[in-house]
């Protein structure tokens, strides 16, 4: 009898499982996904000449139709899924996974059975299905095993009762993937065309950004209002301090709205007699919270440990794969009977009978909990954070948090004696509240969060007199709505039914990566371009951007997973409505199409041509652009002025600071929204309405404004020898020459280093472009050497240079690229060698290609010579 192959996603999980299976099993990892939709278009677009030949005899209408069909075919090829023909998918092995797949195929060929032991959620089910599809062979050999925890007992039980692939779960994952793919690939080009290049849209991510944009606007529209509170410090008959808050006047809530009202109350209270009129003592209890699900773990880790969502899930994944906790992507608060029984025994032994409720505490889960297995808990309650092996310190802290929550959830309530004392002083009523802990219950294990009410009040009784010591009036201002933290945003998404446990972390990560929002001191701030894109999508894709619609779509995905509805029918219904909205959005604005990026004109004159300048918003920020930019080329003015943010950083973690910042901002003269301030120069400050470009309000303030002096690094300019200093423009930080006549710039690389000097483009008039009348110039970019049209950006045609072309014009090449002229120009079959660039190795190499794909023949330059590797199938 041969061995069985077990496939999991990660090497760490494979290592843990391998400990619990015998010598008859080989445990291997797929290292995550092995197959997915294509990462980029795989076929070249026909050249201009070929396209022209194919439509030469066609009518104008036919040409338009052929053009649309060609564009649609190219889009489908790029997306890898065809929504027009039954959602056929073109799955491909992920780059770099070829060796992993080959090894799994080889091992599976010799195995009696193949156990697919990927995670138990839809993503894990999909990975298992892809593995079965690419390995192939008799489907009867494949067995599906799922487990909620990686313990010896759980693994052995799972392998005793293997099941089959859950294709409903696979189809639910595919449906989500396909919808997200269609929205991203079909809406993003529309945003490039209508708003600005480099923008993107996502089915769920755009809705999450909308939440942040709406909160940003609530904050900007908020007008802080003044109010006062008054505390009275008194003494009891036995000289005990007793502080009370003025709560009522004539039986109604009292909250002075200005200093005059507050001081009038102080004057009256100074003359009054203070007498206790009511005392209420009652027992209260505090029950423990449910064990963690994905969202509550993320929130607690943020609040208690300061961890971001991504970090929390990464650490939880490691704890799970090491066998320390149960599966971390769940929205169920259920606990297994065995886990509860073990925990109750642990509580009795270590804390005593008083901490154990007569019956286990039961917590409700939301309806249709997707991963309805168990809450997140320790695999073994007897293992504490101090017992973990091979885990980093942050993982120890997260485990302790999970352990504490799990143990606390099955303990008795905390018991308090709560007291409220009311004191009469003239027409005013003052109050004080206190609470005394009588029995700690669950709080012995998990410290409660929130306002600390545990204070002992003096033993006063009704009729007792108090002596006034002093009155303490304090001014306050109402606060705007709180900014979302990562954890608060997850909580809001969960409340609205948007996303699922397996998607929260990716949603949070994606919205930050796209540049529509930024995180400062763990709070989200919506960027201006995020507001514009949200508005445009909201106007043209009302279903897509509707919170309830997105939540209903999540419910439909749940129904697909349960086998209640046909997955392609759900996709067809979604695509029919979506494509209708897309078709309208692509029209001209006058026909209901998406509005272009609006420019707000100002009275600031262009320093170059004296035309008015307008406030423009690009994906890189807000700037001033000359109104002459839209004129014909000969008259066009491309002058722009970067707008630097006003000096000063708001610490939003400090109480009332954001309120103070709002009060300091100017209000828009049109809509009264708080305005954003930018320094134009040391003489002018531009205040722009927070609703720009929807509102055209702006104010130019003139005066003397201090522009912070330069204190950063300098490098020598490669053009004129002057100093280059660090500058901040709308495209981010860069080095700029201090010589105004030079205007040379250099990029700052991601690692913080200054990019090497740019090589001047090398002109090749002998090499005409195929799609325009221009010729090619050789440019040096982040992806190495490439040919680009000489009339860029009018023509954006590019291609890789051939070695034989560089040899032919070797005298024009810069010295540092002369080595490329010694490369082999052809492979043994006579195919021309193309110059390519490896981002990983940061060096050029040459290879031959067949229909845009590597042939297997390549050469790299090492130690002064070219080394050839030939992996072609027919290579001799």
Curated annotation (Swiss-Prot):
Keyword Amino-acid biosynthesis: no
Site (Interaction with DNA): 33, 176-177, 180, 192, 329, 514
Zinc finger (C4-type): 668-695, 717-742
Main function: Releases the supercoiling and torsional tension of DNA, which is introduced during the DNA replication and transcription, by transiently cleaving and rejoining one strand of the DNA duplex. Introduces a single-strand break via transesterification at a target site in duplex DNA. The scissile phosphodiester is attacked by the catalytic tyrosine of the enzyme, resulting in the formation of a DNA-(5'-phosphotyrosyl)-enzyme intermediate and the expulsion of a 3'-OH DNA strand. The free DNA strand then undergoes passage around the unbroken strand, thus removing DNA supercoils.
Organism: Vibrio cholerae serotype O1 (strain ATCC 39315 / El Tor Inaba N16961)
Gene3D superfamilies linked to this entry: 2.20.25.10, 3.40.50.140, Bacterial Topoisomerase I, domain 1, Topoisomerase I, domain 2, Topoisomerase I, domain 3, Topoisomerase I, domain 4
Region: Interaction with DNA, residue numbers: 200-205
Gene Ontology CC terms, in alphabetical order: chromosome
Annotated Basic and acidic residues bias: 59-69
Pfam families, sorted: Topoisom_bac, Toprim, Zn_ribbon_bTOP1, Zn_ribbon_Top1, Zn_Ribbon_Topo
GO function term, MF aspect, one: DNA topoisomerase type I (single strand cut, ATP-independent) activity
Reactions it catalyzes: ATP-independent breakage of single-stranded DNA, followed by passage and rejoining
SUPFAM superfamilies documented for this protein: Prokaryotic type I DNA topoisomerase, Zinc beta-ribbon
Domain Toprim: 3-150
EC number: 5.6.2.1
Protein name from the UniProt record: DNA topoisomerase 1
Keyword line: DNA-binding, Isomerase, Magnesium, Metal-binding, Repeat, Topoisomerase, Zinc, Zinc-finger
Homology family: Belongs to the type IA topoisomerase family.
NCBIfam families: topA_bact
Domain Topo IA-type catalytic: 166-582
Stored SMART domains: TOP1Ac, TOP1Bc, TOPRIM
Keyword presence, Transferase: no
Residues holding Mg(2+): 9, 119
Ranges of Low complexity composition bias in the record: 38-58
Subunit structure: Monomer.
């Amino acid at each position: 009898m041969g061995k069985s192959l077990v496939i999991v996603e990660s090497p760490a999980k494979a290592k843990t499982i391998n400990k619990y299976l015998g010598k008859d099993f080989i445990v291997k990892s797929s290292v995550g996904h092995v197959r997915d939709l294509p990462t980029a278009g795989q076929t070249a677009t026909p050249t201009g000449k070929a396209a022209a030949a194919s439509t030469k005899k066609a009518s104008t209408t036919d040409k338009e139709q052929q053009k649309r069909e060609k564009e649609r075919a190219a889009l489908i090829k790029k997306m890898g899924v065809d929504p027009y023909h039954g959602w056929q998918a073109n799955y491909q092995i992920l780059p770099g996974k070829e060796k992993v797949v080959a090894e799994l195929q080889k091992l599976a060929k010799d195995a009696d059975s193949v156990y697919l032991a990927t995670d138990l959620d839809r993503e894990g089910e999909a990975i298992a299905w892809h593995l079965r599809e690419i390995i192939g062979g008799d489907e009867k050999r494949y067995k599906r095993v799922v487990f909620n925890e990686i313990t010896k007992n759980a693994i052995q039980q799972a392998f005793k009762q293997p099941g089959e692939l859950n294709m409903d779960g696979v189809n639910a994952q595919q449906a989500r993937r396909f919808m997200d793919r269609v929205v991203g690939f079909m809406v993003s080009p529309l945003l490039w065309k209508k708003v600005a290049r480099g923008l993107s849209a996502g089915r769920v991510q755009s809705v999450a950004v909308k939440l942040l944009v709406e909160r940003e606007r609530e904050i900007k529209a908020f007008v802080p209002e003044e109010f006062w509170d008054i505390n009275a410090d008194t003494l009891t008959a036995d000289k005990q301090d007793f502080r009370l808050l003025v709560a009522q006047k004539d039986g109604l809530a009292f909250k002075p709205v200005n200093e005059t009202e507050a001081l009038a109350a102080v004057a009256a209270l100074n003359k009054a007699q203070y007498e206790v009129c009511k005392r209420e003592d009652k027992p209260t209890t505090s029950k423990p919270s449910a064990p963690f699900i994905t969202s509550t773990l993320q929130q607690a880790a943020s609040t208690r440990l300061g961890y971001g969502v991504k970090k929390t899930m990464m650490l939880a994944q490691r704890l799970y794969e090491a066998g320390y906790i149960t599966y971390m992507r769940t929205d169920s608060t259920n606990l297994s009977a065995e886990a509860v029984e073990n925990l109750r025994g642990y509580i009795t032994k270590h804390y005593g009978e008083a901490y154990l409720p007569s019956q286990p505490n039961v917590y409700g889960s939301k309806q249709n909990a997707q991963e309805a297995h168990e809450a997140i808990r320790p695999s073994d309650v007897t293992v504490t954070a101090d017992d973990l092996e091979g885990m980093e310190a942050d993982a120890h802290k997260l485990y302790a948090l999970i352990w504490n929550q799990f143990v606390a959830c099955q303990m008795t309530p905390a018991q308090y004696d709560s007291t409220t004392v009311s004191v009469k002083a003239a027409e005013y009523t003052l109050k004080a509240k206190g609470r005394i802990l009588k029995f700690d219950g669950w709080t012995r294990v998990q410290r409660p969060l929130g306002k600390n009410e545990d204070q002992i009040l003096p033993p006063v009784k009704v009729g007792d007199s108090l002596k006034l010591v002093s009155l303490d009036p304090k001014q306050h201002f109402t606060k705007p709505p709180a900014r979302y933290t990562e954890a608060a945003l997850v909580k809001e998404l969960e409340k609205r039914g948007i996303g699922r446990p397996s998607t929260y972390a990716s949603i949070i990560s994606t919205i930050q990566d796209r540049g529509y929002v930024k995180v400062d001191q763990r709070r989200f701030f919506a960027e201006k371009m995020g507001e514009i894109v949200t508005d445009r999508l909201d106007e043209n894709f009302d279903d897509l951007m509707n919170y309830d619609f997105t939540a209903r779509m999540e419910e439909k995905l749940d129904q697909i997973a349960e086998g209640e509805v046909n997955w392609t029918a759900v996709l067809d219904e979604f695509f029919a409505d979506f494509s209708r909205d897309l078709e309208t959005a692509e029209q001209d604005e006058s026909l209901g199409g998406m509005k272009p990026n609006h420019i707000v004109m100002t009275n600031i004159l262009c320093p170059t041509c004296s035309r008015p300048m307008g406030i423009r918003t690009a994906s890189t920020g807000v700037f001033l652009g000359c109104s002459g930019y839209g004129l014909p080329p000969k008259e066009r003015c491309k002058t722009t002025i970067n707008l630097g943010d006003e000096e000063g950083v708001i610490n939003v973690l400090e109480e009332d600071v954001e309120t103070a910042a709002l009060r300091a901002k100017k209000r828009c003269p049109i809509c009264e929204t708080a305005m954003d301030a930018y320094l134009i120069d040391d003489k002018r400050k531009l205040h722009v309405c927070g609703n720009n470009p929807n509102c055209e309000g702006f104010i130019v303030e003139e005066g003397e404004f201090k522009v912070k002096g330069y204190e950063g690094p300098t490098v020598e300019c490669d053009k004129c020898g002057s100093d280059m200093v660090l500058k901040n423009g709308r495209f981010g930080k860069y080095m700029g020459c201090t010589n105004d006549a030079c205007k040379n710039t250099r990029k700052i690389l991601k690692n913080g280093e200054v990019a090497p000097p740019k090589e001047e483009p090398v002109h090749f008039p002998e090499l005409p472009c195929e799609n325009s009348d221009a010729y090619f110039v050789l440019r040096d970019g982040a992806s190495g050497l490439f040919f680009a049209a000489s009339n860029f950006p009018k023509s954006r045609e590019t291609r890789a240079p051939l070695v034989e072309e560089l040899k032919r014009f070797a005298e024009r090449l810069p010295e540092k690229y002369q080595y490329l002229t010694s490369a082999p120009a052809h492979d043994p079959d006579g195919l021309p060698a193309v110059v390519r660039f490896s981002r990983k190795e940061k060096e050029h190499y040459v290879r031959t290609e067949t229909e845009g794909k590597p042939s297997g023949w390549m050469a790299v330059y090492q130690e002064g010579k070219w080394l050839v590797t030939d992996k072609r199938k027919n290579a001799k």
